[in-house]
Amino acid sequence: MPLELQTFFYKDKLKPFSCTNLLLGIILIALAGFRLIRNFNNLVDISFDDEVQYMRYGMELFHNIRSDWGPSYNLWYKLLSLFEQSPIELYLLNYKVVIILLPICLFAFLYVYGISFFISIWIGFSILISTTNILTYPRISHVVVSFFLLVLVVNRLWIKSKSRQLILLCFTIFVAAFARPELMLAFLILLAITLFYILKFDDLKKHIVFALPFVAIMILIFAVFRLPSDSFKGIDRAYIAFCQHYTIKNIIFNKGHFNQFIDWIAISKAQFPGCTTFTDIVINFPLVVIKGMFINIGFYLQLIISICTDILFPFQLLPFNKIVLLGYGFVVLFILFILFSKKQRLNLFNAINSNKYLFLVLLVFVLPSVISSLVFFPRMHYGIFLLPILSFVIAILIDNLVKGYKIRIGLVLFLFALFMYKMPTIKKYNTPRLLTNDECPTQSYKEVIKDLNQHTDKPHVIFSNVLSFSLMIDKNFTDFSAEYDYDNSKTFMEQMKAHQVDYVLQTKFLTEDRRLSKDSTWLQFMTNPQAYGFKKKKYFDDCETYLLYKE
């Protein structure tokens, strides 16, 4: 490739870069990704909850604009719906796209910021088949992190002005905050840094024209959606997050016999009387919050070690899974080696110093997820935000360890062929699916939804403890949720009539609902549903899940 073209694609002549290698790496990871997701739609079941709400609100975007559930992620689904209109197919399409998109963006980010081609593509391949990439749910963090990395790549390749780089990053994180609301904190911090940098080291007037389109779009977004929503179904989102994970930790440490999907509401009202927001809990029960944070630190360290292991080792290539424990041990030893090696500490310090603006941006970006993990719980989708900074630090350290060794492209291609040969299918992974507490190997909710799609000629109301179940059905179904809609002061029969329920999805989780098990009208209904005009349809022979319906 002519030197002029390389210079056009890459501003820093001091570090080796090849546009050809960049494109080659993207193509190789994409090919591996296509092999990974082959026969995907036949092997992967659907799940519900948060992801289905994002999807449905995206499908309805512009006809019905919702500001309370990730509107910028809704827009992503709207774009994908140009290719698939069926909810099931759209859900699976998004799943496939983000599985491949994230490792491609991570590889490109590492390579254009000076990491060697071999280390960059190794990490890209490793993340592609990792449980961090494939099993993390919901998928919203994949999209947010991918676009953040993409903007960093654009900044490195085509935008020379640091002020303009910061302006573009501010815009990106502002839009991302309407997918993950906690990122509004990152936006405000980065905005302050951007204004400080421009006013102190640059001339604001030079960048007004560049910034105007982004500012106009931000104003439009704010005018339509206001601030990112802090509530869900009228309940403070922070309160929901804290109380759900308080219940989960209660189950883990106290062997509590609770259903985390339903009982958290009753437990929270009993444990935190008079509290309706997370702020109320902080004010009235500060020691509970502090104790929870110390517990979360331990879980967060485990999450960091798990992600570092996924970055370093493509374990899924091996036929046995217990070797991952060796990986955890190796990561711990690797971290200790870096901490105790003066040379490696110095190398890392020099790398941070030479990329101080990048590290500052990465830290600002990851800060809200760190806070959320420590205050609420370190869920895997918070861990996705750690990928850019952890991958970059690990890549720098490995590059320094192998400095002076040049790995030829031929070896990379040989390893790629070996990787493709040994690569697992998606069937190896326990992909997200609906949890009903049933031992049911044949359970596939795609079949349930496809059957319900045959009955969309008139409106129906379905009672279940599956959040957003009806949103996966094509049309004319609405939910009466056992988790959020059920009124404990009324009997089941009163509510069934009031809400005109004509479908009931019965699962083992619903059977274990302590509220319903004490309700005589529910017990009578389940004993003899035919007396109320309901018929039973059992989809699976090996579990308790079945459907009750009125014709």
Where are these regions (language model features)?
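Signature aromatic-anchored transmembrane alpha helix within multi-pass, membrane-resident enzymes
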Residues: G25-L28, I121, R164-F171, L191-A192, ...
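Extracytoplasmic
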Residues: Q443-V504, K508-G533
